[in-house]
């Protein structure tokens, strides 16, 4: 089956002018701020009798203010990217495992990356993500699963062509107070 489709938009608020290709090639990037919004549409494959589902049987909405701060020499392309945002969830009125209604609190998340190009082919990044909130309740009873976790990652990438590359990432939970465990 298919999962729920996700539709999103991003619009430049500061430092992201509309440019022709020729103007873009000459443009020196400065601080950029965007408005971001997205919606998960609950039309994916879902059956409350199954433990695993591609769909979620609920609407969800994401909003954020991503920003990019170019640092140093534009020829080496070093950027600090910060993407704070919130996700708001609708109710699932037919949750897996029974029960009448599953609700979920809003989830705050901020993701950040410092990336640089070492030369025309090699690039690297360090970053992380903090998540707080998102506890679910089933029929009004708290499920005790609020997220409060900070993860970190390092990435090394190689570009074979401008459109084809390879990257490897290592990530881990740095600190948590919710029992989260993950290594990738």
Regions from the PLM with identified roles:
Residues 1-104:
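Outer-membrane pore/translocation modules
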